[in-house]
């Protein structure tokens, strides 16, 4: 059975199968969205990998990266949020819902998944949870 829980631990220290974070399209390329709380060295590593893979950050694009130094998760799933900046903290709930669903559809069979998308308020958090649930069942 699928369940959702909240934690105050930083995403990098969660011993999960997959960690989901967001990416955005910027005028300069692809960047990570806020909400991931990853250490700077991990951000630099992920940015380099995303550039090598020619990730765009477009809405619902999903890229899986394994063996991210400093991250306990087995893999990091980066899901696109569309146009934005690395400092933008709010996204439409439909975008968050869709991004979470797209990411979760790619991790079928994984027992534990942590989602660290930008959720500045309870409505955004609810949208991410709804999308994650939908992604598990599609």
PLM regions and their residue ranges:
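Glycine-/small-residue-enriched capping loops at alpha/beta junctions
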Residues: 1-138
